[in-house]
């Protein structure tokens, strides 16, 4: 006897779409295809709806030690997100106070900020990225202590933090010494973004790829900087990191015209961005990408199988035996509009509207509009 059967769904398994049903038993995916509904304690009819692996947000702020952090129970579960990466909110001095030892309602991993206090001062003043201030021995100790929770180092390279590329070069060195990756915030840097990309290697993450302030991935002629392309060829990964203020439709269109799409679709949602018209949630970020021309399956991969592979989450795919982390969406068209950091507004020609979230076989959120 199955615990739950989702029938008549449009399934996305982390790679492709197909029609069928999915059964859950004891917190795991028990069958995919056409399991018999009479063998289920609960049957949920998903006719006209899309069922995906629980989404994975590659760039969120939820550590709980800075002013910008959102509650993952609010920022994730109502939007089909069952796992997320905190993008550097905690430093070596605050990590153990934040939640690496605390039970979360979602699967969680953390980038450790190179700065000791992380983002705890962010709304008052920018963090100090001077490498002379980093507590490298303490950072190394934390990576030894929390190998499953920590997935890399984080540094911000906006002009408010750094005047030259030395901090990112030193952060790369430190990351390599720890056998980990570096995520670099590249939004309105003091130097060409290509100079930062030049320093990154395989597995490192360049976030805020499509931001439109100052120096970015586009050259003056509107083409993607060759150094950015070369970085991708070396295995550097590119994240959206939307946050509304870090996403310009015009930049995305130009890059997409050259086939330069993101590897991951991180929302960069914060306490103020959550439910705000700009970023709102991860499904809204995915909806923007598809509306702007990204293939639907490719966009969903950037929030399921791809971040699962990059960060080592167990989910991201529909497969028998996997944890039943699932999301159900209605795909809508012509409902409202999207805005970007420059104030451009476009019609929402594609909108992922959440209907249900399951975490390890338990229904943890359900839309009141859809009783199943």
Tell where the protein language model's regions lie, with residue ranges.
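A structural motif
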Residues: 55, 81, 150, 260-262, ...
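A conserved glycine-rich beta-strand in the N-terminal activation segment of trypsin-fold
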Residues: 16-24
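Divalent-metal coordination cores built from histidine and acidic residues
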Residues: 74-156
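Active-site core of metal-dependent hydrolases
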Residues: 155-276
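Conserved, mostly hydrophobic/aromatic
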Residues: 48, 80, 153, 206, ...
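C-terminal cap of metal-dependent C-N hydrolases
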Residues: 9, 323-372
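His/Asp/Glu-enriched, well-ordered alpha-helical/loop segment
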Residues: 250-331
